[in-house]
Regions:
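Soluble acyl-CoA-dependent acyltransferase catalytic core bearing the H(X)4D motif
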Residues: 1-257, 261-292, 296-305
């Protein structure tokens, strides 16, 4: 207290308390639980996450490693959002285009990567071109993708995926270098013990109030500028009311982010669908055109480009 109405000059003002986000609270809570959990619970956690299956967890060291991995998995990407992919609303715009599967596969192989690596490299190349068209220089953007957790021990046909966030090299002009960088980023992500943590916490999270779940989901999904997903392939012809289906475009959800790009391969064609926010992406026509150019840039590698 004071005898004067104004603050005393020689008394420092108290520092404001740091506001915890729902995601931050969840990280701290889970990290503490993992460190203090008994060995049997940790074994189950690692089993569900697809890591260290069958190995005994007998020391605190492994628990601490899991907790540290959990912090890395949930930490916001260490790069700012792109100024060209800002804002956001409830509207959406859909765009579709096709790419030859053999070309995309050969392009990935030319750089020592996969079809998925080439797909992501093409998207980043398109986003880079969009920034250049707007005279904006951006080296990295936060990107989210699903990562396969399948191992040789999993049964044939089993699918195991977990969401991962990356600081993606959108400013890299060389498509081969982008493919290599993406391949390495995904390989590193697969080594995180806590990557499949959502399977571990699902029984607990499902009991949270709806408003908490909504805020938590918004915080976790809204950290990226771009989300992409390669949904694999349909291995047989499809028919609708007797008519043969010629294309299948996967319209992926856009969970509070500027753009969601999904790819599904059908009869030798990569069917690509873009769901983007017209309020976050001001020049929709340019964005679509640049994405197509990004794929042309990458698929040129298949022909010695």
């Amino acid at each position: 207290h004071s005898r004067e109405p104004g603050p005393a000059d020689d008394v420092p003002m108290p520092r404001p308390r740091r506001r915890e986000t729902p995601e931050g609270l969840l990280v701290n809570r889970l990290a503490g639980k993992v460190v203090s959990a008994p060995g049997s619970a940790l074994r189950e956690a690692f089993r569900v996450a697809g890591r260290f299956a069958g190995d005994p967890i007998g020391t605190t060291t492994d628990a601490v490693k899991f907790a540290m991995s959990l912090r890395r998995v949930l930490a916001p990407p260490d790069t700012p959002h792109s100024p060209a992919l800002t804002g956001g609303g409830s509207g959406y715009r859909l765009d579709t285009f096709d790419v030859a599967f053999d070309d995309l596969k050969a392009s990935g192989r030319a750089a020592g990567g996969s079809v998925n690596d080439a797909f992501l490299a093409a998207l980043l190349g398109g986003v880079r071109r969009y920034h250049e068209k707007l005279s904006i220089t951006v080296d990295f953007i936060p990107v989210a993708i699903p990562v396969s957790l399948r191992t040789d021990a999993d049964p044939m046909g089993a699918n195991k995926f977990a969401g991962a966030r990356f600081v993606a090299p959108v400013g890299e002009p060389d498509p081969k270098t982008r493919i290599v960088a993406i391949h390495d980023l995904i390989a590193d992500a697969r080594l995180e013990p806590a990557l499949g943590f959502l399977d571990l916490i699902a029984p607990v999270v499902s009991r949270l109030p709806g408003i908490v779940l909504s805020r938590l989901a918004g915080e976790m999904t809204g950290l990226s500028d771009l989300q992409a997903s390669n949904l694999g392939a349909i291995g047989r012809p499809l028919y609708l009311a007797g008519a043969r289906v010629t294309r299948v475009y996967p319209m992926g959800p856009r969970p509070g982010i500027p753009a969601m790009v999904a790819m599904l391969t059908y009869e030798g064609t990569c069917c690509i669908a873009v769901n983007f926010d017209p309020e976050a992406i001001a020049d929709a026509a340019a964005f679509s055109s640049c994405l197509r150019a990004g794929f042309e840039e990458v698929t040129a590698l298949a022909h010695g480009g």
